[in-house]
Amino acid sequence: MTGIHVKEGNLFVENILGAELAKKYGTPAFIYSSEVIRNNYALYSNQKREDDLICYAVKANSNLNILKMLVDIGSGFDVVSGNELKKCLLAGADKNKIVFSGVAKSEEEITHAIENEILSCLLYTSPSPRDRTRSRMPSSA
């Protein structure tokens, strides 16, 4: 058996006893199974159309090793901040597989995306609270 499982009352992650991982890394600890991640990605990938792009939401977990693994298996990335964008680029992500989206982007974040030729930028803007209420303020304000 592989991935993450319990056998005879003991937790195993990719056939490594959980107690041994706890001894080596201490607790609490985050332990991930690359096999589970790869298998789950394959389940999605096998169902998509050829032109579809699966984009991992980096805000869910920006661990560099996980991002590198996802790069290796062909994943795209959904990023919402400049730091998430930097991590994906550091992991070796294909700039054509990065979607930079969301609200409240700084000029620095947008410039960084442009300088790195991130072509898929979905930027949503809305007036600031001050601008939205300005029309309701007395003219002397």
Q: Model-found features: residue ranges?
A:
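Conserved small/polar residues in nucleotide/adenosyl-binding loops
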Residues: 124-133
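Hydrophobic or amphipathic alpha-helical targeting/insertion segments
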Residues: 116-122
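N-terminal active-site wall of soluble small-molecule enzyme domains
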Residues: 36-116
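Hydrophobic alpha-helical segments, chiefly the membrane-spanning helices
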Residues: 136-141
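A very general structural signal that marks isolated residues within well-ordered alpha-helical segments
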Residues: 43, 119, 131-132
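N-terminal hydrophobic targeting/anchoring segments and the immediately downstream early-domain regions
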Residues: 1-16, 20-23, 27
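General structural signal for secondary-structure boundaries
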Residues: 14-18, 106, 126
